[in-house]
Amino acid sequence: MATPPKRICIDVPASPSGNKCKVKRISIEGNIAAGKSTFVNILKKANEEWDVVPEPIARWCNIQSCKDEFEELTTSQKSGGNLLQMMYEKPERWSFTFQSYACLSRIRAQLKALGGKLKEAENPVLFFERSVYSDRYIFASNLYEAECMNETEWTVYQDWHDWMNSQFGADLELDGIIYLRAIPEKCLNRVYTRGREEEQGIPMEYLEKLHYKHETWLHHRTLRTDFEYLQEIPILTLDVNEDFRDNKQKQESLIEKVKEFLSTL
């Protein structure tokens, strides 16, 4: 495995007051339908010095749901392929392709966001909806263990992931992780509620395996990775079994916990 690149601090230009502030990079992690998309939208509205990078779902599904800087059509989208649906329908054929493209599109979106609106912020925070680490150690590894990737594909994926991180990883290295913790049963209910067509056939067993991996990595902290700094990275765990989409009091409580967490970084 490649050695992780040395940590490099990314500075934004000096603010009007003359202060130069480093952008804090926080990843929001959690199972499918744990509430990440809802949560990052709440975060974006909570503080003008906070910005978010949502998962580039439209890139994976060929759905131009909204016009923003993360959702422009690419050549692969124009080809008409719904890669997410293809992966769910035939994982043993498309897992390697999907995981490679999912990570690539995530890196592209996150790098682009670093040059965004936070340049003038005093205390800028950029929240990523998932990271390149969960791409590899949660989702891709789970597909390999389920024999949806063969040994050769898994070896190639890891080599590719190592190289991509050697080139761009320092710019995406995290200052902290927020783990949205929800039991698989809640996640499955939310899958049905949000009605994303590609996900309607997801079995409980799949969510249970992903939950176990998230718990091992972020709760018990026993999952070993090739990135040493992750072993000591600060983690805030938020219980999101209770629905918070329309619960203002719950939202405010979560935001306060995030603010307290950020103050320690």
UniProtKB/Swiss-Prot annotation:
GO terms for cellular component: cytoplasm; mitochondrion; nucleus. It catalyses: 2'-deoxycytidine + a ribonucleoside 5'-triphosphate = dCMP + a ribonucleoside 5'-diphosphate + H(+); 2'-deoxyguanosine + ATP = dGMP + ADP + H(+); 2'-deoxyadenosine + ATP = dAMP + ADP + H(+). InterPro entries: DCK/DGK, Deoxyribonucleoside_kinase, DNK_dom, P-loop_NTPase. Disulfide bonds: none annotated. The keyword Transmembrane does not apply. It is found in: Nucleus. Its EC number is 2.7.1.74, 2.7.1.76, 2.7.1.113. CDD domains: dNK. GO terms for biological process: deoxyribonucleoside monophosphate biosynthetic process. Substrate binds at residues 55, 88, 99, 130, 135, 199. ATP binds at residues 30-38, 190-194, 242-244. The active site is at 129 (proton acceptor). GO terms for molecular function: ATP binding; deoxyadenosine kinase activity; deoxycytidine kinase activity; deoxyguanosine kinase activity. Keywords: ATP-binding, Kinase, Nucleotide-binding, Nucleus, Transferase. Belongs to the DCK/DGK family. Homodimer. Phosphorylates the deoxyribonucleosides deoxyadenosine, deoxycytidine and deoxyguanosine with highest activity against deoxycytidine followed by deadenosine and deoxyguanosine. Shows only very minor activity against deoxyuridine and deoxythymidine. This is Deoxycytidine kinase 1. The lineage of its organism: Eukaryota, Metazoa, Chordata, Craniata, Vertebrata. The gene is dck.1.L.
